[in-house]
Amino acid sequence: MDFSFSFMQGIMGNTIQQPPQLIDSANIRQEDAFDNNSDIAEDGGQTPYEATLQQGFQYPATTEDLPPLTNGYPSSISVYETQTKYQSYNQYPNGSANGFGAVRNFSPTDYYHSEIPNTRPHEILEKPSPPQPPPPPSVPQTVIPKKTGSPEIKLKITKTIQNGRELFESSLCGDLLNEVQASEHTKSKHESRKEKRKKSNKHDSSRSEERKSHKIPKLEPEEQNRPNERVDTVSEKPREEPVLKEEAPVQPILSSVPTTEVSTGVKFQVGDLVWSKVGTYPWWPCMVSSDPQLEVHTKINTRGAREYHVQFFSNQPERAWVHEKRVREYKGHKQYEELLAEATKQASNHSEKQKIRKPRPQRERAQWDIGIAHAEKALKMTREERIEQYTFIYIDKQPEEALSQAKKSVASKTEVKKTRRPRSVLNTQPEQTNAGEVASSLSSTEIRRHSQRRHTSAEEEEPPPVKIAWKTAAARKSLPASITMHKGSLDLQKCNMSPVVKIEQVFALQNATGDGKFIDQFVYSTKGIGNKTEISVRGQDRLIISTPNQRNEKPTQSVSSPEATSGSTGSVEKKQQRRSIRTRSESEKSTEVVPKKKIKKEQVETVPQATVKTGLQKGASEISDSCKPLKKRSRASTDVEMTSSAYRDTSDSDSRGLSDLQVGFGKQVDSPSATADADVSDVQSMDSSLSRRGTGMSKKDTVCQICESSGDSLIPCEGECCKHFHLECLGLASLPDSKFICMECKTGQHPCFSCKVSGKDVKRCSVGACGKFYHEACVRKFPTAIFESKGFRCPQHCCSACSMEKDIHKASKGRMMRCLRCPVAYHSGDACIAAGSMLVSSYILICSNHSKRSSNSSAVNVGFCFVCARGLIVQDHSDPMFSSYAYKSHYLLNESNRAELMKLPMIPSSSASKKKCEKGGRLLCCESCPASFHPECLSIEMPEGCWNCNDCKAGKKLHYKQIVWVKLGNYRWWPAEICNPRSVPLNIQGLKHDLGDFPVFFFGSHDYYWVHQGRVFPYVEGDKSFAEGQTSINKTFKKALEEAAKRFQELKAQRESKEALEIEKNSRKPPPYKHIKANKVIGKVQIQVADLSEIPRCNCKPADENPCGLESECLNRMLQYECHPQVCPAGDRCQNQCFTKRLYPDAEIIKTERRGWGLRTKRSIKKGEFVNEYVGELIDEEECRLRIKRAHENSVTNFYMLTVTKDRIIDAGPKGNYSRFMNHSCNPNCETQKWTVNGDVRVGLFALCDIPAGMELTFNYNLDCLGNGRTECHCGADNCSGFLGVRPKSACASTNEEKAKNAKLKQKRRKIKTEPKQMHEDYCFQCGDGGELVMCDKKDCPKAYHLLCLNLTQPPYGKWECPWHQCDECSSAAVSFCEFCPHSFCKDHEKGALVPSALEGRLCCSEHDPMAPVSPEYWSKIKCKWESQDHGEEVKE
């Protein structure tokens, strides 16, 4: 029974789009390639082919002398028929790697038959050919096709037939005619290129005629009258060739069923893995594939060299023709170094070698790593599996769509085009499968033309080729968020997901619009796989096309895959690229069909400068909680690399984070196609809306408080609320003449932002631009609220997620995203924002607390207790928050095997104790999350009514990039990862979801679905133990557990690395504080100011050497009074004004080894000299206790409070000067003194001794210990007490302690007798001889051996036991020993192995005679050494 976990068919989707351009390595010259335009025939010599011509053959004067036959068959025989799935293709090949593509000179058929005419087998004629049309007027003599790309067809490759037989059997027949005619061509390459430039206008018009002449389908009359417009797609109905005036007739395109190539010299076949070198890009892993137009994988180019058609492994599906000398067999990623070494040897100079060895850019490296990951996976497959798994499937546009889009781009370069999209749902038929629409977009840099081409007539310019971008979930995850954002886009934008429509509806809509205005919204693509027909819908809402006027204008994005840059300056022959779709997965092969549910219709607005095509991907369906059985649904097969770090985390460390908003728009991205890959998601998807907004937005958001939407016509209230409103929301027709003040500000009845109750007893937040009002009782309920002397800072200025970590500094700094409806704020990043929040603007959101749960979306609780759960971890119930239980291990209970699983013991954590709890019992279930508890485990009684767990009460939320367990429908709890909405496929974004829902990526099945917090609980390390040893767990679930564990470790490593970087960054500078110069009064404390008459006057004279100095007899200095400049007789010369003048010696903040930050002097300080004043906030005792309490709650351990008097305390924590960094010491070099300065008491620090420069400044804190807790002191002084707040030891106490310590060392000793200890034998136990022996390390074993007897060359390493302790038969522990040799036996082998001997009955083995087990010489050899310990050894009593 298959329990594979899959939630929707094709949700991941294999649909990708071909990038808009191919590699065209025209600038890559192959030195050894054969050039038929510069061979020896130009010098008058004979070509190699001329020597092989049969005697009597004469070249025809014109092509009219040749019969209209090709390869011996009439032209009407369909020998080369386009495959069904390529029927919508135009017949233009993709060009060659040498820059001389067939499209420049030939039609595809002529090119194909001229280069490799032997690749199509001859067919037997079954019916005569119809009569040929009459030949048109004669044409000039045929000349060889040149690289100038002449538009006229000057050559027809045919085979001469004589008497119904081919005149030549050589496969080079098509080339012979070319080579002979090439010998007559005398123009140089430079002249032909010059002629090409002169005739460029003529080329454009004639090229369109040439292309029309080669089209099989019958065009509509209105299209036949437009010879200068390009026709890009082939329709299904053939037509007769129209005869164009003044143009040579062209034979119809011959078609045949595709066959394998049989030409010689082919080294690689379709499905082979190779390395290819294109341009300046590194060697890239590729797979040989068949060209979608020529249907061959190799060909001979115009220079006579072989080329292979390859498709590149990357997240950009690209392909190209590559020269055979630039292709190597792929044997593994380690081969890359060999290729570099080979290229380095071939380099001509040192600079080229350095260029080869230069490290690749990070953007290109990421793409290369993805390609290597694909190639390594493909290397393990067979050729057939690789072809099935990796071959591209190409889909093209209808000609009307390309033409209509091109017309729009030419008519209006900046005007926004809007097109409404029909909404309908396709009912799947048994023999048909929906094809997911490939999301496509258009970039202004991608659709530029390489030159300003104009026709000779005064008609419009030829529309440029329309590029179709591509999108997969894997590639989208590697794109930086700056791609999906647009500066200046301020409107809220919604995502419109186009459903798959019925074929009948498509044709009905197509026929209903005769003017072609609606036809560009549909794309038909028929895959030649069985009877499955794929029909997808594509719509276009906004389009801004900017066509640069200069040829040398550079694009704003760079490229990191090899195909994206070649041909970017493009030529006339740039062709429209095909969107590519990876081959169908295993799920597509299933004949079972999943019924579809209708998807809610939504409007869509796309971003300027990018057209975002949205649609459901292959087989996507929305499923409810009651999912279908797994065996009835086919699972979308996605690459395993989706779960690997190479695939999921190619971009920045936090690629899905909202912090990507800070990325500038001028930065480079991975590929040009990525520019068009702008993700569009529902407005309810918070991050996707944010991803479309740039850094150019104003910092202050403007959102209407009534309709909760942004806009430009918002009126600000001039009152205290700082709110904005729409005129229409206020019911006003025009702006008021005077300042606008809302009704709340007029009446003073502001509602509390927490409880929403209005009244005049509310208080405003102290932050000026906030404008929120609260009841004091309401705001005190939030731990993130900060109370100050002048009021409070509301919770919207502190991150709710960071506050859970008890880091108040981290929580209160940084950019915040605030909830519009409640006092909740988060930092703008995946690590903080609650999953399921909805973005309103760049700094305003609606958090997930406001989700409206329906009756069927309640929480699904687990069937076990989160605390005990059969041996789970017991919490410390003394913590009231009880916040860590959700991160402990859990049972995973399935409906079918719950009873069986409950019998199995859990694997307890080594760091926690077990709680014995009886089986079953009542469970207390949380209403908001799946948590369940036994009431006795929480030490509470069973409450009545609804109950929420402590985590939910505290506001703890799930975050993006978090591994969780998810319960969906009837399936078991499954490991998944919470995804940022903008990182999931577009069809997943379009699924119905509400506020509070977030997408999850299921491991193992690689499916997506929207869930809410009630069905999710966190995954913790070790959860995979639940599945070990269970026979009922299928392969998919085991794979999911492995992937979840791997991903969990990756995220854990990323988080630890980020934290380490943050710690390292914070260690570079001290913690933040506000530097002040004088004390700041807080609360009721006041600063005393004395009258001049009350200030004492000293007796110092101005004529003294140092008036009022350190060594003077200044009366004020002795009484610790500072002189006043208007009272002191010394006047300005007074040296007792250090506090007022702030005469501090130079000092610097330093980082100490164990005591944090410290202060060090830069110059020498004399004893008694003023060092600094201790300044900060002056608070009273009540405020001091509140701050200490708050510090303990937030785990703050550093205090800066210094008591001046009972009601005057200086707190230098939030504000202060350099004195706050002075550390404590039990033997300090500074002391605090209270001085009276202008009538107020202030604290100064003075030197206790002479302090040299470079020494740290310290003073004794003299702390009073609160409670039993003590802080360890690390001052390192000799008299250190060991703890802060404990008095240092005096000299007398230190002397007494030293004497007591020495007295303990003088212990009484007595002599004891010891038993003699037997040492090892001094002879070998094997042979009985002495010498250099190896002794056994086993306790009480005296045996020793020669190395030679042990068959060893050197002594064994470490602890060694001799062979006597191992059984001779099985090498297990021996229990019976032969006492005359090393033979021994275990319990299983001791029977009959040993017998008593005549020598005192000692056991001996079969190698000894029981009557005389040893020889007489044995006793003369034995010398046993007995040693004993010294009897005079002293031991401690």
UniProtKB/Swiss-Prot annotation:
- Annotated tissue distribution: Highly expressed in brain, heart and skeletal muscle. Expressed at lower level in liver and lung.
Q: Which residues form the Post-SET domain?
A: 1269-1285
Major location category of this protein: nucleus
* Protein's cellular compartments: Nucleus; Chromosome
Report the leader peptide range.
Answer: none
Which residue ranges does the UniProt annotation give for the motif KIKL? 154-157
Q: Which residue ranges are recorded for the region named Disordered?
A: 121-157, 181-252, 344-365, 406-465, 540-696
- Residue spans of biased composition, Basic residues class: 187-201
Record domain PWWP: where: 270-333, 960-1022
Query: What role does this protein play?
Result: Histone methyltransferase. Preferentially dimethylates 'Lys-4' and 'Lys-27' of histone H3 forming H3K4me2 and H3K27me2. H3 'Lys-4' methylation represents a specific tag for epigenetic transcriptional activation, while 'Lys-27' is a mark for transcriptional repression.
Q: Which family does it belong to?
A: Belongs to the class V-like SAM-binding methyltransferase superfamily. Histone-lysine methyltransferase family. SET2 subfamily.
Summarize the disease involvement recorded for this protein. Answer: Defects in NSD3 may be involved in non small cell lung carcinomas (NSCLC). Amplified or overexpressed in NSCLC. A chromosomal aberration involving NSD3 is found in childhood acute myeloid leukemia. Translocation t(8;11)(p11.2;p15) with NUP98.
Put simply, this protein is called Histone-lysine N-methyltransferase NSD3
